[in-house]
Amino acid sequence: MEIIRPTLVLNKTICQQNIELMAEKARRHNLTFRPHFKTHQSAEIGTWFQKVGVEKITVSSVSMAKYFAEAGWKDITIAIPFNILECSEINRFSEDCALNLVVDNTLTINTIGTKIKRNTGIYIKISTGYERSGIEYAAVHKIDELLITLSQYKHLTFKGFLTHSGHTYRAASKYEVQNIHYDSLKKMFYLKEYYASQFPKLEISIGDTPSCSISENFMGATEIRPGNFVFYDL
């Protein structure tokens, strides 16, 4: 093969093996596997996931959600705090596609509750150490405010809590990755237990490639969302 311009070259076999290994780990731990289509923003690579039974995906933007919805995906989470300026874009999605948005403040909830007309799933973003966005896990008074606000909008359905331990990428060893992962799990499990009586079907969505690759402990989690494990482009 002669390459005369910048070209993405993949070893398809290795990528598919990586996908199968992560899918098998999710099955082994009875977890929903909702991979983050972050690096592999490709409808074709998306079909590799479908071959191992993946039906739900994660993306980082409304535009990518639209791209994959047009490619046939029917259950998509946009896993960053939602930009309220994009409400009109959400209304353009077909009701055939289940959409989940992520929030971390009441202003966002009130805005989407008023401006978004379609049925929409809502995850509350929790900070478990990365400190980039989200509500601190122990601030249940703030979480309660969001839940009360959410309850005012019948077309918005609270799904659960979502976190991303992005600081595992700065870890210097597997041991440090494990420590970060376990700390995050404990914090999310605390919330799951705290709200169990109010929301018995509460989802706990976690997922970064380092933790999901190394760990065999997913206590309390219901869903994993690793992304760049497909290429391991760390």
How would you label these PLM feature ranges?
Residues 1-10:
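Generic N-terminal amphipathic, Lys/Arg-enriched alpha-helix
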Residues 36-170:
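Active-site-proximal beta-alpha core segment in soluble small-molecule metabolic enzymes
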